Amino acid sequence: MARFTLPRDLYHGKGALEALKSFKGKKAIICVGGGSMKRFGFLDRAESYLKEAGMKVMIFDGIEPDPSVETVMRGAEAMQKFQPDWIVAIGGGSPIDAAKAMWIKYEYPECTFEDMCKVFGIPELRKKAHFCAVSSTSGTATEVTAFSIITDYSKGIKYPIADFEITPDVAIVDPELAETMPKKLVAHTGMDAMTHAVEAYVSTANSDFTDPLAIHAIEMIMNDLVPSYNGDMAARDRMHNAQCLAGMAFSNALLGIVHSMAHKTGAVFADYGAHIIHGAANAMYLPKVIAFNAKDETAKKRYGVIVDYMGIAPKDASDDEKVKALIAYLRGMNDQLNIPHCIKNYGADSYPCEQGFVPEEVFLERLHDIAVNAIADACTGSNPRQPSVEEMEKLLKCCYYDTEVDF
């Protein structure tokens, strides 16, 4: 038996943030990063709408990109003191992901972070509070998913929390919020969304319910991501819907090893000042993983179907030719978005940059542990081709050096 779960309500279109006025409750806590949502007035608007609904409002701000276990615990402690019956997370993937984990700890104070990371092992929520997610970036789609990503910086590892219990009750997809994204964020989150859709379509858990969402998301991203990156606000608005569709698909079809690798490489080089932003990691790894997965005949045929919908190769081309066309197309899209093709070149587009570089000797020294951790990641189980540790090491090397995947 399979399951398909979405938020009960999804408000979309410009002005959708006003839906907060209709919420019923006594207290609401707003979880936010604090930067752009404050600067552009969306935090003030959210607070005023909730107060208009008759609620007392508390703001928990300062949630960092790639939120830490410590931030989750601080937020849960604030919730215990305030006792909200609504948790409203507003911003990109980081504040929403953090708030989801805080929600678990708020409802179950005895729950440890290790408990949260047990796949589909979260106890029943909503005994204390309901959850609303308001997305401001067009990529993570965490506003509609059963996932959260939290980083344990003491280990340098990002851990996915996966359970349908943390699917938000309400999602607000208001494109006005996404219009504030800086150019680089448009690129990274957009390729995150493309990866979600492609991985969902070839996942071993794909279904008749998720396939149409994934394919339509791919078509929309193909048409709108690069124009959005170049300042077309109508395309930016459509991308906000596209990434949400991709999220609905992958939340139910699950993901694959692009995400496993991104989770385990994102923070592991942080001690060298080299943080590989999640969307950029996905963009770099996706073409390599497609080449690896295409050795599986079922996956190869499904990549071929994606190419048929995209129209980037003749219908009568072989599946092998279609896979090559898809890889070439995605690499070309990365070029247009100024995203490098490999870890070795990561950060070269904006030196000196906030990400830093990943030294070759450090990468090779940590390669085995990264491979082991990637295989243990929750996303690996639904990948169409299961890699050995040795194969994962080879694949990661291809992602570092931008070499051909021929195994």
Segments predicted by a language model, with ranges:
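Short, amphipathic C-terminal "tail helix"
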Residues: E361-F407
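ATP/NTP phosphate-donor binding region
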Residues: M1-W86, I343
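Glycine-rich phosphate/pyrophosphate-binding beta-alpha loops
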Residues: G139, C244-N282, D377-G381
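Flexible, glycine/charged-enriched surface loops at secondary-structure junctions
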Residues: T204-L213, S228-R238, A253-V258, I276-G279, ...
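Gly/Pro-rich interdomain helix-loop hinge
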Residues: V268-D271, H275, G279-V362, V405
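Glycine/threonine-rich beta-strand-loop-alpha-helix active-site module
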Residues: E70-E176
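Carboxylate- and glycine-rich phosphate/diphosphate-binding segment that chelates Mg2+/Mn2+
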Residues: F147-A253
